[in-house]
Curated annotation (Swiss-Prot):
Region (Pore-forming): 599-620
Record's protein name: Glutamate receptor ionotropic, NMDA 2A
Membrane-topology annotation of the record: Multi-pass membrane protein
One Pfam short name: NMDAR2_C
Purpose of the protein: Component of N-methyl-D-aspartate (NMDA) receptors (NMDARs) that function as heterotetrameric, ligand-gated cation channels with high calcium permeability and voltage-dependent block by Mg(2+). NMDARs participate in synaptic plasticity for learning and memory formation by contributing to the slow phase of excitatory postsynaptic current, long-term synaptic potentiation, and learning.
Subunit structure: Heterotetramer. Forms heterotetrameric channels composed of two GluN1/zeta subunits (GRIN1), and two identical GluN2/epsilon subunits (GRIN2A, GRIN2B, GRIN2C or GRIN2D) or GluN3 subunits (GRIN3A or GRIN3B) (in vitro). Can also form heterotetrameric channels that contain at least two GluN1 subunits and at least two different GluN2 subunits (or a combination of one GluN2 and one GluN3 subunits) (in vitro). In vivo, the subunit composition may depend on the expression levels of the different subunits. Found in a complex with GRIN1, GRIN3A and PPP2CB. Found in a complex with GRIN1 and GRIN3B.
Positions marked as site (Functional determinant of NMDA receptors): 614
Gene giving rise to this polypeptide: GRIN2A
Biological processes, Gene Ontology terms: calcium ion transmembrane import into cytosol; excitatory postsynaptic potential; glutamate receptor signaling pathway; long-term synaptic potentiation; regulation of synaptic plasticity; synaptic transmission, glutamatergic
Length: 1464
């Protein structure tokens, strides 16, 4: 009963399940049933009920099968009992699969299960014990699968362990256990095909059936410290026992075995040494219950896949009892569906050999407690090990530890320790690196992680390798876990110091700073690197300031430069030039001509400005020696100034990189960071010597910086570059290296690596370590041999340190030049504002400034006069209103008619002979049309062409009250003393506003009132001469009564209420008459009656004027030209009174080409001869008359003895005017110390006219001689030279005319036709018209006694020839009509053509602003060439008339007064 009843109870549940569904038809239509048996050994702490509950509805959900689990526990697991139990189960129930696990380590169990599966075709899964052991040569028809790893897979893990710990040298020991050949073959193949430098020294195969002596002989061949062993567990006990006897299981030997040797981890033979390494299936993390559940899931998933594909599952084998026959292999089995299985998210696939594709293997080691300890895991083809350095175990008590193998800890910190990944191809470390292990956390919450193999190199690693070779030790290197140097926290040391203190490492090598606190717990070697504390900051790209172009000099330098320019230098140059005897003198002292070219303060500033900045601008250079020296020194200063500016400009135009400047740990930015906006941010890496130093010395600083501390150096560098940190405080050696190797060299250390709290790096050893002395000696040896210096050059020198002195250039963009453009934009805006103000002032405000709004002198004029008054101490009286002048309309009309009648009477003086002249005839025709114009107030007959003035109707209007008001407001003016507006005779000193005349006369001028400002200068000139003036005061009173009552002594002659703004700045001064009431009378050499002296047609006003002129003869006139208009030479004035026009003169065609006469050889006049060629034949007085500066050598009123007495010395020529004195007739080669009489009398010590200095005298030789001498040699040459010569610009906008005057010594500006011919007779130019035509064409006689060579004149940009000027009309017409000269003369400039013929050479009272007449009939101005104009006026010479206002003005003429108003 016992045996049968037992099996009955065992098989009954299966039978019930198998037979239950048969009677029910409905059940047949349900899901097919899948019966799975679970058989386990009785030693497992699990019951059958628990096994059945492992598969519940949750696991079966979604499956198309009805899974039934049959659990069976076995008490005995011997092979016979095992086979009996399986066969009885199969006979009692129809099962589709079996999950089997035992508690043995016998590989025979797996062989029996494989046999049963091959005969019954029932899938069997061996999940534990012997059922999962490695077996060789499975049956091909078997469906036996194991939860385990194949021999190849385990061998791979064994080699991976050796590779991670760099155990490249090993030996292989096996027995003849099944599978050993495959094991040896796989290892050899892997080693031969790997890039790892494996060294398999020995392959030993032992036969344990022989005696132990033979085994010992074979084991003695082993010389490696790493041994791979492949055998069964029983054979391993024998082999390891023999190895112990041979000393192969000591401190330095590593035995690595597969799971076949370790077997059941609960059974550990005593022969196994400590430190034995085994590769085993994971029994720690993969429990038996999980394996059972996975086994049932594999069978269920495979059956479902087969059912889905074939719609059925294979029938189970009924029993294993019966005849031993080879059954037929079923057409479809579960085998192919069990190969690729994924269940519950896990890949549970199997290989063709029946092993798992992804087995869960672990690395276990037999620790010193004789227990198996899990130290690593193989998962997804990745090995992770717990120990960074494989622990060395003392296998047995009789084994001595190896003291030469050291465990060394280090810390990653470039350049001292640099950590890199292993080579992906070889999976090893390359040449100059050593293997080191780094702990990597897998789970931050549980601090779970693994040690990964890395490669270390660097400065400290090279020192470690040298120490290893010198001191003779081996080592295992690993990186510190927490990445710290070492700090005591809660009385516990961390970091590298903690590893040494707690003896997990023998020594610590790296950037470990030596300090007092650490020295108390560890021993330090001698320092091998000097270091300390330094500060690193980041360069930030600065922006170029708009004022960068001003930054080469400081503000004080710019201010000093402008002060020196505007205040000191410019004023100094102006003052030196002002008071210089040869300069552009503006002084109005005695003898100084006031109207030379002015050198003002503005011109001085402009000159110095141009010199400073090397601008090619037109400037006026000074002439004084002192001022020239000053300008030369300024030019030298300008060279230095500009060179310095240019040299420094590039440094300021580039974008400057801004660097925070700190001086040390005690800097204000560190101690008081909140004083800056934003606050200064700085930090360090905690738990280091730097933090300790700051904490002990600067508590407040340490408290502030804790929130900015960084995890490591690399994080700090990123924070610096991104602007999260302003400064980083750390070890100087590390920071210097990082600064030298930084990409872009953006990081710098303060003070070029300045170090605070200097210390050094050392090697930390355990307290009392025997290695300290040997390491110290080795380090000192490295320093002495220079090896340490080589290492520093290799590792501690960065590229940025080598290139820090290199200059990098880059293009300048708009940011660099923005300041210059801003300055230009500001200048344009300022110019626009000035332009608007200028127009506003000109059109709206200038009348008030000139006195139009208030009946007072203009503001600018008053300021100028006031400044002059302050400088020269001249008192200026206030003006008084002129008396009222009433004029009725009938009186005005009568005066107009009388004036017209006067002009008509002037025409009666024309004789018939002169009417034949084309000029006279055309003039008569022209005058005829002007009679009614005079009545209409359009002009007068005397000056018919000058109609550019404004008509009377525009001045007075229809209302005569306007005339009364206008006339009442008029001031005293010699030029406007007449009722009719127009041109009137002018005195010589009134004729040219651009020419200042200083006359030495024997008579006082009656009709002229000099300005009060001239009292000192003019009166001082005339003191001697006025004493001899015989003109009585009665004449003056009479003349004063004859003049109109407009005149008032309280008004200056040129001052007007309606003055032109253009004239007020540079008026010519007029002379003030002497204050003495009684003037001495002058001896009159010729007395004539009044009737014969004055023309009958003269008006009362003009007669008064002529009397005044006749009473004041001036024998010597000295003129100094003012600022000239762009120039043309004035031809000599011709007066028909002194020249008899020949009646038979053939006037050529006015439109004839001038070049034709030139080709015909017409006579020409040489104007460019040397004036000193033929003067020996003349007398002294005649020679002296040749100079245009003077009339004669003596005055009319002075005795001859005074003149002779003055020149008794051996004199040559005048030092001022260069004229020859009577006692010398030769050429002068040096400057004479003597002066002529005229220069002495005038006090004109220095002539500032630059043209006068170039003048040379000429000998008035006969015309034929001069012509013959000069024409042949100068004809072609002078023609070419004159084309290239450019004359100095002079103002010739005023044309002279012969004034009407009976006094030949002072001719009037208006005369009759009869007097015109008489006056021309005997004149210096009178002989010009009497020359026969044969003389002109034949002999080359000179018509002019003197000439001025053009080559010695100052140059101008305007052409010499008027024909070259496109703005002037042709001069051929009037040239022929006036003087009859050939228009093709290449050496002279003729008169410009006029649309309307002019009867005489007349002057124009219009300014240069109005050359054209109002009716647009052409040019009205007559220009006379300058080269024949005498420079010293004699009684036959005329002067140009003054410029007047334009046609729109009130036609008042003002004389210019020197003032500084034009300067500003």
């Amino acid at each position: 009963m016992g045996r049968v009843g037992y099996w009955t109870l065992l098989v009954l549940p299966a039978l019930l399940v198998w037979r239950g569904p048969a009677p029910s038809a409905a059940a047949e239509k349900g899901p097919p049933a899948l019966n799975i048996a679970v058989m386990l050994g009785h030693s497992h702490d699990v019951t059958e009920r628990e096994l059945r509950t492992l598969w519940g509805p949750e696991q079966a959900a979604g499956l198309p099968l009805d899974v039934n689990v049959v659990a069976l526990l076995m008490n005995r697991t011997d092979p016979k009992s095992l086979i009996t139990h399986v066969c009885d189960l199969m006979s009692g129930a129809r099962i589709h699969g079996l999950v089997f696990g035992d508690d043995t380590d016998q590989e025979a169990v797996a062989q029996m299960l494989d046999f049963i599966s091959s005969h019954t075709f029932v899938p069997i899964l061996g999940i534990h014990g012997g059922a999962s052991m490695i077996m060789n040569d499975k049956d091909p028809t078997s469906t036996f699968f194991q939860f385990g790893a194949s021999i190849q897979q385990q061998a791979t893990v064994m080699l991976k362990i050796m590779q991670d710990y760099d155990w490249h040298v090993f030996s292989l020991v096996t027995t003849i256990f099944p599978g050993y050949r495959e094991f040896i073959s796989f290892v050899k193949t892997t080693v031969d095909n790997s890039f790892v430098g494996w060294d398999m020294q020995n392959v030993i195969t032992l036969d344990t059936s022989f005696e132990d002596a033979k085994t010992q002989v074979q084991l003695k061949k082993i010389h490696s410290s790493v041994i791979l062993l492949y055998c069964s567990k029983d054979e391993a006990v024998l082999i390891l026992s023999e190895a112990r006897s041979l000393g192969l299981t000591g401190y330095d030997f590593f035995w690595i075995v597969p799971s076949l040797v370790s077997g059941n981890t609960e059974l550990i033979p005593k022969e196994f040494p400590s430190g034995l390494i085994s590769v085993s299936y994971d029994d720690w993390d993969y429990s038996l219950e999980a394996r059972v559940r996975d086994g049932i899931g594999i069978l269920t998933t495979a059956a479902s896949s087969m059912l889905e594909k074939f719609s059925y599952i294979p029938e189970a084998k009924a029993s294993c009892y019966g005849q031993m026959e080879r059954p037929e292999v079923p057409m479809h089995t579960l085998h192919p569906f069990m190969v690729n299985v994924t269940w519950d998210g896990k890949d549970l696939s199997f290989t063709e050999e029946g092993y798992q594709v992804h087995p869960r293997l672990v690395v276990i080691v037999l620790n010193k407690d004789r227990e198996w300890e899990k130290v690593g895991k193989w998962e997804n083809h990745t090995l992770s090990l717990r120990h960074a350095v494989w622990p060395r175990y003392k296998s047995f008590s009789d084994c001595e530890p190896d003291d030469n193998h050291l465990s060394i800890v280090t810390l990653e910190e470039a350049p001292f320790v640099i950590v890199e990944d292993i080579d992906p191809l070889t999976e090893t470390c390359v040449r100059n690196t050593v293997p080191c292990r780094k702990f990597v956390k897998i789970n931050n919450s549980t601090n779970e992680g693994m040690n990964v193999k890395k490669c270390c190199k660097g400065f400290c690693i090279d020192i470690l390798k040298k120490l290893s070779r010198t001191v003779k030790f081996t080592y295992d290197l690993y990186l510190v876990t927490n990445g710290k140097h070492g700090k005591k926290v809660n009385n516990v040391w961390n970091g590298m110091i903690g590893e040494v203190v707690y003896q997990r490492a023998v020594m610590a090598v790296g950037s470990l700073t030596i300090n007092e606190e650490r020295s108390e717990v560890v021993d330090f070697s001698v320092p091998f690197v000097e270091t300390g504390i330094s500060v690193m900051v980041s360069r930030s790209n600065g922006t170029v300031s708009p004022s960068a172009f001003l930054e080469p000099f400081s503000a004080s330098v710019w201010v000093m430069m402008f002060v020196m320019l505007l205040i000191v230098s410019a004023i100094a140059v102006f003052v030196f030039e002002y008071f210089s005897p040869v300069g552009y003198n503006r002084n109005l002292a005695k003898g100084k001509a006031p109207h030379g070219p002015s050198f003002t303060i503005g011109k001085a500033i402009w000159l110095l400005w141009g010199l400073v900045f090397n601008n090619s601008v037109p400037v006026q250079n000074p002439k004084g020696t002192t001022s020239k020296i000053m300008v030369s020194v300024w030019a030298f200063f300008a060279v230095i100034f500009l060179a310095s500016y240019t040299a420094n400009l590039a440094a300021f135009m580039i974008q400057e990189e801004f660097v925070d400047q700190v001086t040390g740990l005690s800097d204000k930015k560190f101690q008081r960071p909140h004083d800056y906006s934003p606050p200064f941010r700085f930090g360090t890496v905690p738990n280091g010597s730097t933090e300790r130093n700051i904490r002990n010395n600067y508590p407040y600083m340490h408290q502030y910086m804790t929130k900015f501390n960084q995890k490591g150096v690399e994080d700090a560098l990123v924070s610096l570059k991104t602007g999260k940190l302003d400064a980083f405080i750390y070890d100087a050696a590390v920071l210097n290296y990082k600064a030298g190797r930084d990409e872009g060299c953006k990081l710098v250390t303060i003070g070029s690596g300045y170090i605070f709290a200097t210390t050094g790096y050392g090697i930390a050893l355990q307290k009392g370590s025997p290695w300290k002395r040997q390491i110290d000696l080795a380090l000192l040896q490295f320093v002495g041999d220079g090896e340490m210096e080589e290492l520093e050059t290799l590792w501690l020198t960065g590229i940025c340190h080598n290139e820090k002195n290199e200059v990098m250039s880059s293009q300048l963009d708009i940011d660099n030049m923005a300041g210059v453009f801003y300055m230009l934009a500001a200048a344009m805006a300022l110019s626009l504002i000035t332009f608007i103000w200028e127009h506003l002032f000109y059109w709206k405000l200038r009348f008030c400034f000139t006195g139009v709004c208030s009946d007072r002198p203009g503001l600018l004029f008053s300021i100028s006069r006031g400044i002059y008054s302050c400088i020269h101490g001249v008192h200026i009286e206030e003006k008084k209103k002129s008396p009222d002048f009433n004029l009725t309309g009938s009186q005005s009309n009568m005066l107009k008619l009388l004036r017209s009648a006067k002009n008509i009477s002037n025409m009666s003086n024309m004789n018939s002979s002169r009417m034949d002249s084309p000029k006279r005839a055309a003039d008569f025709i022209q005058r005829g049309s002007l009679i009614m114009d005079m009545v209409s107030d359009k002009g007068n007959l005397m000056y018919s062409d000058n109609r550019s003035f404004q008509g009377k109707e525009s001045i007075f209007g229809d209302n005569m009250n306007e005339l009364q008001t206008f006339v009442a407001n008029r001031q005293k003016d010699n030029l406007n003393n007449y009722v009719f507006q127009g041109q009137h005779p002018l005195t010589l000193n009134e004729s040219n506003p651009n020419t200042v005349e200083v006359a030495v006369s024997t008579e006082s001028k009656v009709n002229s009132r000099p300005r009060q400002l001239w009292k000192k200068s003019v009166d001082s000139i005339r003191q001697d001469s006025l004493s001899q003036n015989p003109v009585s005061q009665r004449d003056e009173a009479t003349a004063e009564n004859r003049t109109h009552s407009l005149k008032s002594p309280r008004y200056l002659p040129e001052e007007m209420a309606h003055s032109d703004i253009s004239e007020t700045s540079n008026r010519a001064t007029c002379h003030r008459e002497p204050d003495n009431s009684k003037n001495p009378k002058t001896k009159d050499n010729f007395k004539r009656s009044v009737a014969s002296k004055y023309p009958k047609d003269c008006s009362e006003v003009e007669r008064t004027y002529l009397k005044t002129k006749s009473s004041s003869p001036r024998d010597k006139i000295y003129t100094i030209d003012g600022e000239k208009e762009p120039g043309f030479h004035l031809d000599p004035p011709q007066f028909v009174e002194n020249v008899t026009l020949p009646e038979n003169v053939d006037f050529p065609d006015p439109y004839q080409d001038p070049s034709e006469n030139l080709r015909k050889g017409d006579s020409t006049l040489p104007m460019n001869r040397n004036p000193l060629q033929n003067e020996e034949g003349l007398s002294n007085n005649d020679q002296y008359k040749l100079y245009s500066k003077h009339f004669t050598l003596k005055d009319k009123g002075s005795p001859h003895s005074e003149t002779s007495e003055r020149y008794r010395q051996n004199s040559t020529h005048c030092r001022s005017c260069l004229s020859n004195l009577p006692t010398y007739s030769g050429h002068f080669t040096m400057r004479s110390p003597f002066k002529c009489d005229a220069c002495l009398r005038m006090g004109n010590l220095y002539d500032i006219d630059e043209d006068q200095m170039l003048q040379e005298t000429g000998n008035p030789a006969t015309g034929e001689q001069v012509y013959q001498q000069d024409w042949a040699q100068n004809n072609a040459l002078q023609l070419q030279k004159n084309k290239l010569r450019i004359s100095r610009q002079h103002s010739y906008d005023n044309i002279v005319d012969k004034p009407r005057e009976l006094d030949l010594s002072r001719p009037s500006r208006s005369i009759s036709l009869k007097d015109r011919e008489r006056l021309l007779e005997g004149n210096f130019y009178g002989s010009l018209f009497s020359v026969p035509s044969s003389k002109l064409s034949g002999k080359k006689s000179s018509l002019f006694p003197q000439g001025l060579e053009d080559s010695k004149r100052s140059k101008s940009l305007l052409p010499d020839h008027t024909s070259d000027n496109p703005f002037l009309h042709s001069h051929r017409d009037d040239q022929r009509l006036v003087i009859g000269r050939c228009p093709s003369d290449p050496y002279k400039h003729s008169l410009p053509s006029q649309a309307v013929n002019d009867s005489y050479l007349r002057s124009s009272l219009r300014s240069t602003a109005s050359y054209c007449s109002r009716d647009s009939r052409g040019h009205n101005d007559v220009y006379i060439s300058e080269h024949v104009m005498p420079y010293a006026a004699n009684k036959n010479n005329m002067y140009s008339t003054p410029r007047v206002l334009n046609s729109c003005s009130n036609r008042r003429v003002y004389k210019k007064m020197p003032s500084i108003e034009s300067d500003v």
